[in-house]
Each structure stands twice: as structure tokens, then as C-alpha cells.
Amino acid sequence: MMIRFYALRPFDEQAYCEPYSKQYGIDYAYTAEVPTPDNLELAKGCDAVSTNPCLIAPEYLEAWAAMGVKFLPCRSIGYDHIPQQKAKELGMRISHSWYPPAGVADYAIMLMLMCNRKVGQILRRADAQDYSLNGKMGRDITRMTVGVIGTGNIGRTVLRHLSGFGCKLLA
């Protein structure tokens, strides 16, 4: 099997390619570029095209299918960036990575807390040696109503973890 990786990150993803290639007998080629009409030909001779959550237009799928690509493994939790109906019509299979729901939920909650406490602003001002308190007053999550759209594994885990904060939850 030959797989073409688009938008492969050299600082973390690339390190896995060589050992898994040898372990599973998979040949691969990669580019750091996202798929564009100008580089679709890179997938010629490949059985699979792997992407991150970058835009995949229906025309890309048509071009890849004409080259013999049958499998689209995504390096992301979801695959909403791929036109699923078009892939199905072309006989292409889509898969996606599994991530621990608790890790993703905790990351989402961390970002919520950082926004509520204006951490970005605080860090930027600290870089400029500005430690004044003006405009740094955050919001208390316990007094907030938090809505979660999508209550699959990750959404349910977010709700469960947020329940300890005492905020009102909507799902």
C-alpha cells in the first residue's frame, strides 16, 4: 500500500511515519502543503491520501479517485472537512484518528477557563512588563451557563468534567 500525506507536520507527525511504515509494510510520501488543485497529482499511484482538517473540495476527491485512491484516513478527530457523500459516491472509505475523550475535553475546558480569565491578554501584557490590573478582571465560571453542542463521547466528557465547576449546563 502507498499513502500520500498532505500537510504533514514535521515537528510531531513525521516521526511516526518511518517506524509504522516498516512495521506495517506501508510505503509513503509526504508534503507539508495542504491539498490544492496544483498539488493533487502528488497522489498519483497512491492507494490512500491522509490529511489533517484542511479543506477537501469534491473536485479533489474526483481527481484522487481517478488516480486510484480508495482510502482517506484523516489525522483529526472528525472528518467534516471531507465531502462524505461525494466520497461514498466515488467508493472511497474515510477513517479518522481516535483521541482520548478526557484529553480533548480537558483541553476544551482549559481554553474556556483561559478565555474567562483573559490569560492571553495577561500574558501579552506581562511580555511588555505591564503587570497592572486594569482590564484583567476575569469571569467566574461557577456563575455562568455553559452550553455544549454535540454530546457524543467528547461532549459528554466535557459536561461531566464541567459539572465539578458548579456552572449551569445545557446540552
Task: Report residues per predicted region.
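N-terminal glycine-/charge-rich "phosphate-binding" loop or analogous flexible N-terminal tail
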Residues: 1-46
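Phosphate/diphosphate ligand-binding glycine-rich loop within oxidoreductases
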Residues: 46-123, 135
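Rossmann-like dinucleotide/phosphate-binding beta-alpha-beta segment
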Residues: 136-171
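A short, aliphatic-rich alpha-helical micro-motif
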Residues: 42-44, 66, 141
